[in-house]
């Protein structure tokens, strides 16, 4: 889901 992706990006900003 988008929520999971957004959370992942926030936790691991490349």
Curated annotation (Swiss-Prot):
One MF annotation (Gene Ontology) recorded for this entry: toxin activity
Keyword Secreted applies: yes
Cell compartment(s), UniProt: Secreted
Keyword Acetylation: yes
N-acetylserine: modified positions: 1
Tissue/organ expression: Expressed by the venom gland.
GO biological process: chemotaxis; positive regulation of mast cell degranulation
TM annotation in the entry: none
GO cellular component terms listed in the entry, alphabetical order: extracellular region
Free-text function comment from the UniProt entry: Venom component which lacks hemolytic or antibiotic properties, but produces an inflammatory response via mast cell degranulation and produces a chemotactic effect on leukocytes.
Name this polypeptide is given: Polybine-2
Species per Swiss-Prot/TrEMBL record: Polybia paulista
């Amino acid at each position: 889901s988008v929520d999971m992706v957004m959370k992942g990006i926030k936790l691991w900003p490349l």
